[in-house]
């Protein structure tokens, strides 16, 4: 929980889908996976497809929200990074099995699925300890 109401999400928000024109205007392309989803979907995918440190990822979450995240918000979005990473890792395994090379993303998604799941679970455990 903690993500708020569903909203329109791109669901494939990673660097190649962000274009910037000569005037500096940004465009988000490739909308075939778009739909109504938890707001964590897009930021989770964006971080999962980047090579950020944990601190950088937490900064991205704060920028996305427009404020310092509460403990509940942070664990929710960290959990979404883990889920998005796991989803894309499984997709990458399938692509590799079909002889389509995924590259370094496969390792990044594997690493992030484990790392961010652990971070989110630790935050849930901390809350239970103080409840």
Language model region names:
Residues 2-3, 32, 46-49, 78:
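Generic anion/oxyanion-binding catalytic loop in active/binding sites
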Residues 1-41:
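Active-site acidic catalytic loop and adjacent metal/ATP-binding pocket
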Residues 40-69, 82-100, 119:
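Active-site activation/catalytic loop segments of kinase-like enzymes and analogous catalytic loops
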Residues 90-131:
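ATP/Mg2+ or Mg2+-diphosphate-binding catalytic cores
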Residues 75, 79-83:
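Start-of-helix signal in alpha-solenoid helical-repeat scaffolds, especially tetratricopeptide repeats
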Residues 69-75:
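Juxtamembrane loop-transmembrane helix junctions in multi-pass integral membrane proteins
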